[in-house]
Amino acid sequence: MIFSDYITKQDVASLPFGFQHVRTLRSVIDEYYQKAFSPEIINALKITDQSGYMAKLISEHFEGEKTSGSTIESTEQQLQMNLYYICQKFSDCIRKIKLKKNITILIDGIDIRPSQIPYLDYIDCIRGLSNACWSLNTELFANVKDSKGHCRIVLLLRPDIYNSLNLQNAANKLADNAVFLEWRTTYSDYKTSYLYKMANRLLSYNQEKNIFPDIWEEYFDWDIPSSNLKARKKDTAFTEFLKISLSRPRDIQRILSILRNIMIQKGIDSQDKFDYSVFQSNQFQNEYSEYFLSSLKDQLSFYYSEEEYIHFRKFFDYFDSPQFSFDEYHNIYNQYLDYIMDNAPEIPEFMESPKSFLQLLYDSNIIVAIEKDGKYFHFSYREKSPSNIAPMVLYSPDIQYRFHYGLYKKAKLGRYNN
């Protein structure tokens, strides 16, 4: 229904009666909503709820066409028959539409669970929506013949939530339908990355003339001692940003925004370069750490309640150092479990076992697993791929762990120093 209402005459190839099928359906939609504006998903749900009336309207507008043996009288009495009749009419029209170009419908906001809806109920809703989109994309839209363009519905969904849906053939569905945005990079090769190109593009906006092909270096000419002399002679502003971020465009944008705001507050915004001392300041580290924890809360709020998140935050109070061993983790976990037993009305699911809780920390990119005395560093976001959307944390006595730099200040782990 949303696709039928969205499509315009300019999208349809110039064929006899090419747009007539869409126009007919649109007239049904307009009549149903008394000439309302473009329907949202809630209106589509309303059609489902009042399917008898909608089936009757469709029948009137398609008068003279056969209805595959089903009558309006019978569909009014049976919800499934109503829905089948409505879907068939929409599907029949869409199969006859010849598009000039591809049309993609993006469905966002799914990874924000309303607090009044229980987690398991919401997962069932998303699972149903995912299966419906899969069915439309593969069984209907992909089979429209002789059309230059095709329609596609894309769910904007976090990998961890997709993994929670437990869909059949989930790996194949992801491989065939997902768009993998590769923002990851390394300290030595970041200048070839899409993330760095995005940052350059961001700084080039509103420039009278982009005379610098590498405008980032004009704004950030910081000369920073290398944190790894074996790998590189010096560090740069961008490597510093990578250390405290999760290699996401929004992280880079937020860092720039905080730096700019602090420089304005200090009255040094007339400078034509970003000030390194501002980046090193407690104010910056506090504000960025607050942003990092806010993002973490948004991620965890999909699964857990506000009260459970408050108890989760208490875990950081048991650490004196940001780096800890496997044995230290187990000792602190037991202390933390005692706190949960004494203060929580019931034991949260994330406290099922020491390993499951460590996995949650890893999935949330709160910790990095350090292998072979610092030779290898494993972050969940760096290990993820379309074929491995839920990498497992390394769990053995010879592994060290460290909290992410981005949350040091607000987690009371001290200052981050490069």
Predicted features and spans:
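P-loop NTPase nucleotide-binding core
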Residues: 1-104, 113, 159-162, 352, ...
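Extended charged low-complexity segments that act as oligomerization/scaffolding linkers
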Residues: 1-48, 176, 184, 188-207, ...
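Short, solvent-exposed secondary-structure capping/transition elements
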Residues: 3-12, 115-119, 142, 164-166, ...
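Charged, low-complexity, helix/coiled-coil-prone segments
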Residues: 25-32, 59-81, 136-146, 182-185, ...
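Hydrophobic transmembrane alpha-helix bundles
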Residues: 39-58, 135-147, 177-198, 245-257, ...
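The catalytic "switch" region of P-loop NTPases
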Residues: 84-106, 110-229
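C-terminal leucine-rich, beta-strand-based interaction scaffolds used for sensing/assembly
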Residues: 231-418
